[in-house]
Amino acid sequence: MSLSAFYVTGTDTGIGKTFVSCILLHMLRGRGQRAVGMKPVASGCTYSDTGWRNEDALALQAASDPTPAYDLINPYALPAAVAPEIAAIEAGVTVALEPLSAAFTQLRAQADVVVVEGVGGWATPLNATIDQATLVRALEIPVVLVVGLRLGCLNHARLSTTAIMADGLRCIGWIANTIDPHMARIEENLALLRQRLPIPYWGHLPHIPPGINPATLAARLHPQGD
């Protein structure tokens, strides 16, 4: 896999972007690459002796090698567990591209690959003037889509893919992540997604119970070019 960075987005919030990003980091590390994660903007942070910290960003930090400073992984750590734009307003913080680009540049200098995890679904804004598409353009990186397998995934996946491409960005692959273990016709839905999405398929993750080490699932993902 020759990419130096990519952006992980999803069909919705709560569909496993962080877990998939951690699996990708372990996959890359298993191939001898220095791989680090980044969560540019995170809401729902908790305060500790070291400052505001986000659970997802900490998971990315733990899956990274080398281990970057937390402030590079998560430049904007917002307390309220709401949409980032609302959380930033409540915290009196203005999210700007410059600190995000600067942190990303430092991470790229430390690693062979940077896995950047987005917020919510693709259309979730960062503030009144910055969408995730704005950030991805500024970083000049492609997008990987995580599709949460549950009722409605066909619609959500097709809309998300269309939106990414309409924004003029390159979507280089998609990963199916089983959110609802009781979803009817999972294989049939997966087959339809593979037929209808005009982007490469990187693999399918089964429903994973809490506590599973993401490193154990690295072999299930196969980025294009492998």
Curated annotation (Swiss-Prot):
It catalyses: (7R,8S)-7,8-diammoniononanoate + CO2 + ATP = (4R,5S)-dethiobiotin + ADP + phosphate + 3 H(+). Keywords: ATP-binding, Biotin biosynthesis, Cytoplasm, Ligase, Magnesium, Metal-binding, Nucleotide-binding. It comes from the Bacteria. The active site is at 39. Pfam families: AAA_26. It is found in: Cytoplasm. GO terms for biological process: biotin biosynthetic process. It is an enzyme of class 6 (ligase). ATP binds at residues 14-19, 56, 117-120, 177-178, 206-208, 213. One of its GO terms (molecular function) is ATP binding. Its EC number is 6.3.3.3. Its cofactor is Mg(2+). Substrate binds at residue 43. InterPro entries: DTB_synth_BioD, P-loop_NTPase. One of its GO terms (cellular component) is cytosol. Mg(2+) binds at residues 18, 56, 117. Pathway: Cofactor biosynthesis; biotin biosynthesis; biotin from 7,8-diaminononanoate: step 1/2. Catalyzes a mechanistically unusual reaction, the ATP-dependent insertion of CO2 between the N7 and N8 nitrogen atoms of 7,8-diaminopelargonic acid (DAPA, also called 7,8-diammoniononanoate) to form a ureido ring. Homodimer. Belongs to the dethiobiotin synthetase family. PANTHER family: DETHIOBIOTIN SYNTHETASE (PTHR43210:SF5). This is ATP-dependent dethiobiotin synthetase BioD. The gene is bioD.
